[in-house]
Amino acid sequence: MAFLDQHPGLGFPAAAGLGLLIGSFLNVVILRLPKRMEWQWRRDAREILELPDIYEPPPPGIVVEPSHDPVTGDKLKWWENIPLFSWLMLRGKSRYSGKPISIQYPLVELLTSILCVASVWRFGFGWQGFGAIVLSCFLVAMSGIDLRHKLLPDQLTLPLMWLGLVGSMDNLYMPAKPALLGAAVGYVSLWTVWWLFKQLTGKEGMGHGDFKLLAALGAWCGLKGILPIILISSLVGAVLGSIWLFAKGRDRATPIPFGPYLAIAGWVVFFWGNDLVDGYLRFAGLR
């Protein structure tokens, strides 16, 4: 770690390359985890309802199963799995079917690479930098899944929360107390908004996964990060959500996933939360 800190000319390219590899794996998580969950839900539903057991082959696993063409099912060659560059070499089209390859693949890989470089630039090549990479990767995966399926899996939100709490036990970013309070207040704050909205309208304004994601971000950003995360995510959500509705020609009743906006706000607050608070206090004349 010290070697990379002393030689950033090697460390930053290494972080960028690592980010591309992780981004390729995150694409697999984004595509396959919801399918595995839906398959398990159907099995559980048949068991609970005491319906006849119907054999349904499980979807491809996340780690073991090799990558394949999403249209034809052909196993990909090794060079077709090279992150980002394979998409460029294939000019965004499948070699087997000729159909376009989703822009999601290179975007997720490139974004993850940029976030990994930003993590080590901000926190260095030690454990803090590693933790920032872990947080960034979880947020990318959850945002991708929420955008596609309007779902924030417990398989991602809860481990992220526990990782933040475990890190606080070693005072990685903060002591344990503000991390615990951040997780608790993060969950309760959005749950309260959800409950009040449901009482007033009879509708659910957000999913329970949003509560858990904010709890996870509270474990990483601490209690003082909750309010900035809520404010930033609400602002970003209002602006980008309105643009998306206008571009798609949808009405205001169309549900919009809130997870990506929480992820953006949480990432910003985690990286620059103290600077944001200090800047606001100086602007308000309170410091």
UniProtKB/Swiss-Prot annotation:
GO molecular function terms listed in the Swiss-Prot or TrEMBL record: aspartic-type endopeptidase activity; methyltransferase activity
Disulphide bridges, residue numbers: none
GO biological process: methylation; signal peptide processing
Subcellular location: Cell inner membrane
Main location: membrane
Substrates-to-products reaction catalysed: Typically cleaves a -Gly-|-Phe- bond to release an N-terminal, basic peptide of 5-8 residues from type IV prepilin, and then N-methylates the new N-terminal amino group, the methyl donor being S-adenosyl-L-methionine
Coiled-coil intervals: none
GO CC annotations on file: plasma membrane
InterPro entries noted in UniProt: Peptidase_A24A_bac, Prepilin_IV_endopep_pep, Prepilin_pept_A24_N, Prepilin_peptidase/N-MTase
Membrane topology type: Multi-pass membrane protein
Transmembrane residue ranges: 10-30, 101-121, 125-145, 177-197, 226-246, 253-273
Keyword tags: Cell inner membrane, Cell membrane, Hydrolase, Membrane, Methyltransferase, Multifunctional enzyme, Protease, S-adenosyl-L-methionine, Transferase, Transmembrane, Transmembrane helix
EC number: 3.4.23.43, 2.1.1.-
PANTHER family: PREPILIN LEADER PEPTIDASE_N-METHYLTRANSFERASE-RELATED, TYPE 4 PREPILIN-LIKE PROTEINS LEADER PEPTIDE-PROCESSING ENZYME
Assigned protein family: Belongs to the peptidase A24 family.
Function comment: Plays an essential role in type IV pili and type II pseudopili formation by proteolytically removing the leader sequence from substrate proteins and subsequently monomethylating the alpha-amino group of the newly exposed N-terminal phenylalanine.
Name listed for the protein in its UniProt record: Prepilin leader peptidase/N-methyltransferase
Organism this protein belongs to: Xanthomonas campestris pv. campestris (strain ATCC 33913 / DSM 3586 / NCPPB 528 / LMG 568 / P 25)
Source taxonomy: Bacteria, Pseudomonadati, Pseudomonadota, Gammaproteobacteria, Lysobacterales
